[in-house]
Amino acid sequence: MSWQQVDDPEKVESWFLRDTPVFEILEELSPRRDEAVFDKLAMSAFAGTPLEMALRDLGIRAFAIAGVALEIGIAPTVWHAVDLGLIPVVVTDACGGRDHSAMQRVLDDFRFSGDPLLTDVATITRLLAARPSSEAGP
């Protein structure tokens, strides 16, 4: 309710209804045919989805994460990943948010704990480009 700035549960509206424009994946970010897409059902992308099992089945122990709402969507996923023994790499300048002071608190918490790694788009792009082709994946 606080995110939508309403004081009555009856006034809360779902913003991300399947098959609506706000739910669509941008063309520039469209997954390849060999990439899986999981609908995020809760604050953490791991809650109610097969994401953890998929990552473990593929032998993935670390992953990059970015998105629209650092303070309400990305942070819960990052902390859940840490609890699961995974290494989240937060691409800080590819994370948006509505409440800048809350975003700063989240980043400060990440830095304080040392569990998630923090990077920026330029660094992760350079590192991914430098990978040998055998590591590049499909």
Predicted stretch roles:
Residues 2-138:
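Active-site-adjacent betaalpha module
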